[in-house]
Curated annotation (Swiss-Prot):
Protein name: Endoribonuclease YbeY
Cystine residue pairs: none
Positions bound to Zn(2+): 120, 124, 130
One matching Pfam family: YbeY
Cofactor field: Zn(2+)
The record's free-text note on cofactor binding: Binds 1 zinc ion.
Gene: ybeY
NCBIfam families for the chain: rRNA maturation RNase YbeY (TIGR00043)
Subcellular location: Cytoplasm
Secretion signal span: none
Similarity annotation: Belongs to the endoribonuclease YbeY family.
EC number: 3.1.-.-
Biological role: Single strand-specific metallo-endoribonuclease involved in late-stage 70S ribosome quality control and in maturation of the 3' terminus of the 16S rRNA.
Native source organism of the sequence: Staphylococcus aureus (strain bovine RF122 / ET3-1)
Keyword line: Cytoplasm, Endonuclease, Hydrolase, Metal-binding, Nuclease, Ribosome biogenesis, rRNA processing, Zinc
Length: 155
């Protein structure tokens, strides 16, 4: 079973939006051929908290929209197939303040921006990145493909 543990430190995220994000990430999981028995967390924070996280764990003293911590990132390939435990993908942390600003700037809903950022963070958990131009093209292309197939567009 695909499990997402949601935590809202801001009180701004409506319960219905959890369902949309869960459905989107379930769709993305299938598109990326991730096994059903996987789990991750999504936490919603304000600017102050995400800046503190960014400073502490990434040595960047600035606000950002989303941060992901992949649990498998630095782990060697370990075969868990014989064990009855879920694959833990990691943690996604979304700044609701920045999400609202970006939604206003792009002319779409706060709800759509939360979905976009959740998917962006999810792809990071799977190993996608945008450090080089080629990686950016691959990641953003995949992101757009999944969003369009799911039906979460900027309109």
């Amino acid at each position: 079973m695909f499990t997402i543990d949601f935590s809202d430190h801001t009180g701004l995220v409506k319960d219905a939006w959890y369902k949309q994000i869960e459905d989107l990430l379930e769709f993305a999981k299938k598109e990326e051929h991730i096994e059903d028995d996987a789990e991750l967390s999504v936490t919603f924070v304000d600017k102050q908290e995400i800046q503190e996280i960014n400073r502490t764990y990434r040595d960047k003293d600035k606000v950002t929209d989303v941060i992901s911590f992949a649990l498998e990132e630095d782990e060697p390939d370990i075969d868990f197939s014989g064990l009855d435990i879920p694959r833990v993908l990691g943690d996604i942390i979304i700044c609701t303040d920045v999400a609202q600003e970006q939604a206003n700037n792009y002319g779409h809903s706060f709800e759509r921006e939360l979905g976009f950022l959740a998917l962006h963070g999810f792809l990071h958990l799977l190993g996608y990145d945008h450090m080089t131009e080629a990686d950016e093209k691959e990641m953003f292309g995949r992101q757009d493909t999944i969003l369009n197939a799911y039906g979460l567009t900027r309109d």
